[in-house]
Amino acid sequence: MPRFILIIFILNFYNVAFSSTKNEIIYKLKQTKNLSFDFIQTINEKNENGSCIIEYPKKIYCTYNNLNQKIIVSNGKSLVIKNQNSGNRYIYPLKKTPLIILLDKKILISKITVLEPRIIDNKYLNFRIFEHNTEINIFFDKKTFDLVGWQTEDIYQNLIITFISSVKINKIIDNNIFNLPIED
C-alpha cells in the first residue's frame, strides 16, 4: 500500500509540474502580440540564416541572408516565397502549410492545452502538433518558456529545422511589411 501511495504521489507531482509548465507557456503566448528574431534554418543539412517578424494572428515576414535574397511573407491568408534576385515568386494558401499552426495563437494554445510536452536534452520542451493535415514540432526553453524553434517538412518532404535567437517581444512594427510582394 505505501508503494501505491508513493507512485500516485510521484505521478501527481509530474502532472502538476507539466501543468504549471504548460500554463507558463500559454501565459507567455497570450501576452505576445508579435515577436522578432534571428534564425538559422537547416534544410537537408544546408544552413541558411536571416531574421523574421511574426505578428499574431497569422502574419510573418522573413528575410534570408543568402545569395538569392529570399523573403517569406504572409498576410494572414496567403504565404509568398520570393527570390528577390530572380523575381521568382511562389504563393501558397497559408492554411495548407505547417506555419498556420505556429502563426495562429488560438490553434497553438488549444493544442498545447491538451498535449503533454516531451523533454529534450533536459533543456527544451517539445510539443508535436497535428492540424490541417500537417505536423509541426515546436520547441520552448525549459527554464524561460520562450519559443526557441520548430521542425517541420516542406512540400517536398524535406526536413526543415528552424532555431531562433535574439528574440524581442511586442516591438512596434510597420504592418506594411506583411503586404504580399507583387510580381516583377
Description of each model-found segment:
Residues F4-F13:
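Sec-dependent N-terminal signal peptides
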Residues A17-S19:
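Boundary at the C-terminal end of the N-terminal hydrophobic targeting segment
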Residues Q31, I53-K59, S74-S78, D121, ...:
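Short, solvent-exposed coil/turn segments at beta-strand boundaries
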